[in-house]
Swiss-Prot record:
The organism's place on the tree of life at top rank: Bacteria
Native source organism of the sequence: Cytophaga hutchinsonii (strain ATCC 33406 / DSM 1761 / CIP 103989 / NBRC 15051 / NCIMB 9469 / D465)
Protein name: NADH-quinone oxidoreductase subunit H 2
Membrane topology listed for this record: Multi-pass membrane protein
Function description: NDH-1 shuttles electrons from NADH, via FMN and iron-sulfur (Fe-S) centers, to quinones in the respiratory chain. The immediate electron acceptor for the enzyme in this species is believed to be ubiquinone. Couples the redox reaction to proton translocation (for every two electrons transferred, four hydrogen ions are translocated across the cytoplasmic membrane), and thus conserves the redox energy in a proton gradient. This subunit may bind ubiquinone.
Molecular function per GO: NADH dehydrogenase activity; oxidoreductase activity, acting on NAD(P)H, quinone or similar compound as acceptor; quinone binding
GO biological process per UniProt: aerobic respiration
Parts of the chain that traverse the membrane: 1-21, 71-91, 100-120, 136-156, 199-219, 254-274, 301-321, 342-362
Source taxonomy: Bacteria, Pseudomonadati, Bacteroidota, Cytophagia, Cytophagales
Amino acid sequence: MFVVLFVLTLILLYAVFVVWAERKVAAFIQDRLGPMEVGPYGMLQTIADLIKLLQKEDIIATGANRFLFRLAPVLIFTAIFAGFATLPFAPDLIGSKADVGVFFMITIVSLDVVGIFLAGWASNNKFSILGAFRAIAQVISYEIPLTLSILAVVLICQTLDLQEISFQQGIYFVNKQELNTSLFGITSLGIDVNKIGGFVSWNAFKYPFLLLAYVVFFIASLAECNRAPFDIPEGESELVSGFHTEYTGFRFAILFLAEYAMMLLVAFLGVVLFFGSWNTALPNIGSLHFADWTSGTPGTIAGYAWGLFWLISKGITVVFLQLVMRWTYPRLRVDQLMNLCWKILLPLSLFLVIVSGVWVVWMKI
């Protein structure tokens, strides 16, 4: 119950902050100030907008399927919220420890597209249903390279448990499976990355080809979130607002919150798989035990605090990169989007899976 309340509070506070941050990022890139009037530096603008949004009239179109129209936003948010259940927030802080956490996460990330289709179809609006069709085609296409990029990590780590993957990238890893913990998997170097800790022990640095896997993961996750430059399902110039054209008031707020929650979820997932999860970024250097000093002991208050700090810091950094991407790159056409997926990302992700398999076999020789 504590984790449920913690995640819900985290999502709400994050949404308030990131909506303001997105406006400021957009303003900076477009050489303007952004919100400045409500609160210091406009920091309370999101609260004001939320109050205004909740006062809006709840309108349901005459021809809409009222039951499914109401159900869709709840289904979308619930699917995304459930994804946080198996995320490790600290060494001993996880909603539900699952041995197949990676599989659960891949499944749950895909479920929100069902709600998107219901939202588009139940609205009985041509723009909404076209947006829903685009979202389905996009998500199904990008699900494949996304899953393959994750599979590359799973092959290396030899587990589907997200908490175990987290431990493998830090100083508290107990090597029960006799995994190769040498830098680049080369035992002759004599460098045990788990003793050094910090960024040196992260998957993306321990196995350099996984940096390329993360690039595939990041691009595919943007498409999963329907974020620019992959926001074709919501193309304002073509579809008004896509699948949520007919939504107003509180239900629109739920859809808006779900989109930002999805951004945070895939950011956290990428951090857990590639960038050390809740482990510190600072390595031990000689007598300077930065990793030890900035990790805390698992099961203690310091362990929880440091774990949350590092995971949230890394996650927010990725979200910031997502925001910059939106205001930097133009929206792709549908054919460009599909070409990128099927002709570039899919072959690249397949190649990375093969490299991971060969790497694992080579490390055991």
